[in-house]
């Protein structure tokens, strides 16, 4: 009897310590998805991440989220305009600026599509996690970005990712 009274609490503590909540697993999966997409995953430095939040379609963002994205993109665009003389002098741009411009144009296309489509809030479709990170690209140049990872309703599968550069 004495042995069981010690083993049962010990076993329950081990089980509790080994269990992670589904939301913690989604954050971990989002980080793994990010690592798998990078040229140099060992150089990844995650600077922030959100807890999983409800998603209502992979193209629906709240007004606050869109405003945040547009503010970030505005800062990046102003940096690019300054470095390239209003995009009139791209030939002298350094590799970092060229890479930033490429990533900004890709993100701008996605954001414009979201805004102009004005996707209404649909039914609950799953979860989303945002990760801010720093890493190096295929040329070894350091960069910063914000990555959105969308999961299915069960939080087990990544269904879409979306990324914008950070200044």
Task: Give residue ranges: language-model regions.
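Sec-dependent bacterial lipoprotein signal peptides
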Residues: 1-17
